[in-house]
Amino acid sequence: MSTTSSSGIERTLRGCRPADVDPVVIDAADLDSTAPDHLRDLKQGLAARGYQPAAVATEAAFDAEGTLERQREADRLRGLVRAASFLGAGRIEVAVEDEPSEEARTALAALAERADREGVEFVRVDGAA
């Protein structure tokens, strides 16, 4: 749950001005790494070219039967939430094919909570991205 009041957001917005940057959505498959050094270089390179990451987009693959595979996928998605936050992206878009299992829904709910703690909006997109 956000601790920033609506009036605080409005007050901040009143002082905003346009920036000469283009928002971009980064496809997670295009990230070579989510290591901080790589993300720092990527963020600097994008800024130098006039781009600001607005979102990181990915597909969730929870179709595996085994607990270990589901845990690996949850770990990968958590890493992408951290990457989105590090890059300054305001949201992570997660495409989910079909109706996820109960375990996948639990993992997605935990991911949404993590995103909230990291200051990133979690957006679930139904179907393949």
Protein language model annotation of sequence segments:
Residues E65-A129:
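Active-site acidic/histidine proton-transfer and metal-coordination neighborhood
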Residues M1-Q71, D75, D116:
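N-terminal pre-domain/capping segments
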